[in-house]
From Swiss-Prot:
GO terms for biological process: enzyme-directed rRNA pseudouridine synthesis. Responsible for synthesis of pseudouridine from uracil at positions 955, 2504 and 2580 in 23S ribosomal RNA. This is Ribosomal large subunit pseudouridine synthase C. SMART domains: S4. The lineage of its organism: Bacteria, Pseudomonadati, Pseudomonadota, Gammaproteobacteria, Enterobacterales. It catalyses: uridine(955/2504/2580) in 23S rRNA = pseudouridine(955/2504/2580) in 23S rRNA. It comes from Buchnera aphidicola subsp. Schizaphis graminum (strain Sg).
């Protein structure tokens, strides 16, 4: 492993940085520095604000002068994701952009952020390609294998406003999925608590468990095929892998779901297009614009692979 030592950096806190705890701010800023080291350099007084020592829970104020000392960090590996094709794939999928928001139609197979062996995700990519953006954060997340609407905030106050809307359930997201079998007309809601677990291989998996958090998902049949059903889905809660686990619980897993699907069922499906992606797509999002107060409705079209697969079905 290769390491490098950073130089001293001075940051003047602006309105997009205020009201954050210093430990959380540094964790975002110092990507390859362990959280334990961040706490250590705060506790030992190496991090200074306005030339004074601070505690990890100190909240940043506008005009604060933050001094970050030289820090030994792990060098980033060069990522194969920064290719022309990757760049084109993301930039051509921008659905909406203004001074406050960036909304894209995320392709399947691209993570929203780095981690777990992934060097770059959507957020890291846009930060690299747009270094002049002072602030850029994910408003919400969608699974790596799910395609569709993804919102990023370009101002901290926009992020906080949208997070408030999400907490108050004022943001509505809709999905479509192709599931195995004929979905019953009477099955319009699945309401089962979800619990995060970790398997022996450290992989995270979500299970239905009474000790878990409440989760509620609504379903509506869009079209039935011979062996599959296209369903419209509205999650009322935003739990990790909620839709994938609730469809499995209903006995109708999503096609080509490698974690929660049924491999034998996937193998039995005639796959003329050789598609191998999770057939789950975030089709639209409704929210109030954080600056203008305007009602927003953003729609993400299906990608060509999902669309072509549907065209092969009878």
């Amino acid at each position: 492993m290769k390491y490098k030592t950073t130089s001293v950096s001075i940051i003047y806190i602006n309105e997009d940085m205020i009201n954050q705890r210093i430990d959380n701010f540094l964790q975002k800023k110092l990507k390859n520095v362990p959280r334990s080291m961040i706490y250590r350099i705060i506790r030992t007084g190496k991090i200074r604000i306005n030339k004074k020592r601070i505690k990890p829970d100190y909240k940043l104020k506008i005009g604060d002068k933050l001094r970050i000392p030289p820090i030994k960090i792990l060098c980033e590996k060069k990522s194969s994701l920064l290719t022309t094709e990757y760049k084109k794939n993301l930039l051509n999928n921008i659905l909406y952009e203004d001074n406050y928001l960036l909304i894209i139609n995320k392709p399947s197979g691209i993570a929203v952020h780095g981690g777990s062996g992934i060097n770059l995700g959507v957020i890291e990519y846009f930060r690299k390609i747009r270094p002049l953006e002072k602030f850029l954060e994910l408003v919400h997340r969608i699974d790596r294998d799910t395609s569709g609407v993804l919102m990023l905030a370009k101002k901290r106050r926009s992020l906080l406003s949208l997070h408030k809307q999400i907490r108050e359930k004022k943001v509505q997201k809709k999905y479509i999925a192709l599931v195995h079998g004929l979905w019953p007309l009477s099955l319009r809601k699945v309401s089962e608590p979800l619990l995060k677990t970790h398997l022996k291989n450290k992989q995270r998996k979500i299970l239905i468990n009474k000790e878990g958090k409440p989760a509620e998902t609504y379903f509506k049949i869009k079209k039935q095929y011979l062996f599959t059903t296209l369903v419209s889905i509205t999650p009322k809660t935003g739990r990790t892998h909620q839709i994938r686990v609730h469809t499995l619980h209903a006995g109708h897993p999503i096609l080509f779901d490698k974690r929660y699907g049924k491999r034998d069922l996937d193998c039995n499906i005639k796959n003329k297009t050789k598609i191998n992606r999770l057939l789950l797509h975030a089709t639209s999002i409704n929210f109030i614009h954080p600056e203008t107060g305007k009602k927003m409705h953003i729609v993400a079209p299906l990608d060509v692979y999902f669309k072509n697969y549907l065209n092969t079905l009878i």
